[in-house]
A protein has these predicted regions:
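RNA-binding basic/glycine-rich loop and surface signature characteristic of RAMP-family CRISPR effectors
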Residues: 1-166
Length: 166
């Protein structure tokens, strides 16, 4: 995949039926809905889906979710330090070259190159903000959505009981 050099404008259509494409963790993971009843997918959700697809395609991704983490790094700082070239730049402290850090990060990680990234870690003097050419806006459903909640009921005994009353 080539280096992204220009701003890219595009639209996408996502077809979702009988699914929760972007649950809200602050609302019991119910679907995100506008006040008018339209479904909403946040820009963060869309970027996560793009990152996951790029990761599946073999691209180096900096912001990996815990459930799709392929390098076993438990934080962004650990991932930055694990990269030999970028980690070496971080360790230079106040002598770090921000331009060199920018070049390394954009070369190494497709999502940094695409969406940008802020590198500001506790204990590091290198603070780096990278702007990417791809910006993502929230998506909304074409029609209002109906939210139905289904409760699961148990119809069998999981253990034997000593006495049954019929």
């Amino acid at each position: 995949m080539g280096v992204l050099q220009n701003k890219i404008d595009f639209e996408g259509i996502i077809v979702v039926e009988n699914a929760n494409c972007n649950g809200d963790p602050l609302n019991g993971n119910m679907p995100r809905v506008t006040y008018e009843g339209y479904g909403e997918m946040s820009d963060v959700c869309i970027k996560r889906k793009i990152r996951n697809r790029l990761l599946d395609a073999g691209e180096n991704i900096f912001v990996q979710s815990d459930d799709k983490c392929i390098d076993k790094c438990k934080s962004l700082k650990a991932r930055a330090e694990a990269n030999e070239a970028f980690g070496a730049e971080l360790k230079k402290g106040k002598k770090a070259d921000a331009q060199r850090g920018y070049e390394i990060a954009c070369k190494e990680w497709m999502d940094v190159r695409s969406f940008g990234q802020v590198f500001a870690f506790k204990g590091s003097d290198l603070s780096l903000g990278i702007r990417g050419p791809v910006s993502v806006q929230p998506a909304f459903s074409v029609d209002p959505i109906d939210i139905t909640s289904m409760q699961i009921t148990k119809s069998v005994n999981s253990e034997d009981k000593e006495e049954f009353y019929w």
